Amino acid sequence: MATSQTKELPRPQLFTVMTRYIPGLVLTGVITGLALNVGDMPWFINMGLGALTLAILFGIIVGNTLYPWLQPVCSDGVVYAKQYLLRLGIILYGFRLTFQQVADVGATGMVIDLLTLSSTFILACWLGKRVFGLDQQTVMLIGAGSSICGAAAIMATEPVLKADASKVAVAVATVVIFGTLAIFVYPWLYQLNLHYQWLPFSQETFGIFAGSTIHEVAQVVAAGHAIGPDAENAAVITKMIRVMMLAPFLLLLSAYLGRSRIKTSGEKREKSAITIPWFAVIFILMAGFNSLNLLPAVWVNHLITLDTILLAMAMAALGLTTHIGSIRQAGVKPLLLALLLFIWLLVGGTGINLFVQHIALV
C-alpha cells in the first residue's frame, strides 16, 4: 500500500532574505533616523557633529546595552549594512563633487591638498609604528581619517585593510575629538592673526588652509562659517578636493598592501594578489558624471540625502559591533598619535599653505 508523505515546501527566497536582513537593517535605520534628527539641531550643527558621527555614537551605546539580546535576529542585517551599504554610500558620495570645484580652487589648492594629505599619512605611519608601536590597521585608519576626510575616509579604508570594528571605532573617535577641537581653534587663530598680522592670510587663503587641514566636511563647514563667507566657500571647495583624492588613495593603498603581502609571504605574484576597491573607481566615475550636470539639481540633492542615510546606517552598524572594552584596550597611544597629527596639520599645514601660495605668486 502506497503511503503519501507530506513534504514541507521551501520558503520563498524573498521571505528568507527578509527574515535574515530586515531586522538588522531596521535597527540601523532607526539609529540613523535618530542621528539625522539630532544632527539637525542648532547646537550639534554649531559643534560640527553630523549624522555620521552621531550614528556611530548612538550605535555604540545601543551595541553595548540592548544589542546583545537583539544580535541573534539582527546580526545579518547589521553586517550587510556595515559592508555593502558602506560601499554604496562611498559610490554615491561622488555626487557631492564636480570637477568644476577643482577648477575653482585651481592648481594651488590641489597641490596644497596633495602635499598635506601625503605628508600627514606618511607621518602617521612613521609615528604610529616607530614611536608608538601601534599595529598597521590602527595607524593607517587614523592616518586616513586625519589626512583625507575623517570618518568617511576611515570607513572607506576599512574594507581595504579588512580592519577590526574596534580599531575603526578608535580611529573615528580621534577624528571626532580633534576635528571638533578644530572648530573652535581655527576661528580663534584667524582672529588672532587678523589682529597681529603674523602671517599673510586673507579670509579666502585662510579658508583654503582650513579646508586642507580640518578632518570632517561638517567640521570644515562649521569652522569656515565662523570665520566668514569667503573663508567658508574656499574651505568647502578645498575640502571637496581632498575628498576626491580618497579614491586614488584607496587604489594606491590597495596596491601597496598587495605588494607587501607578496613580499612578506614570499609567494609568486598573481593577478589576484592586488585587490582593486572597485567602489573607489566607481566613486570617481560618479563625480565625473555629476560634473556633466545631466541630472536635475533636485535629483542630485535626493541622491546626496540617500548617500547620507546609507553612510549613517553603515556607521550605526559599526557602532553596534564595537565593544567599549576593546576601545579601552587600545589605550592612550592612538589618541597621542592623533594629537601629534593634529599639531602637524596646524603647524605643517600652515607651512605648506604659505610655501605653495608663495611659489604661485613668483
Curated annotation (Swiss-Prot):
It is a multi-pass membrane protein. The chain crosses the membrane at residues 21-38, 48-70, 102-124, 139-161, 168-190, 240-257, 278-300, 305-327, 334-356. Its main location: membrane. It is found in: Cell membrane. Keywords: Cell membrane, Membrane, Transmembrane, Transmembrane helix. Pfam families: Cons_hypoth698. It comes from the Bacteria. Coiled coil: none annotated. GO terms for cellular component: plasma membrane. InterPro entries: UPF0324_pro, UPF0324_YeiH-like. Belongs to the UPF0324 family. This is UPF0324 membrane protein YPO1307/y2878/YP_1285. It comes from Yersinia pestis.
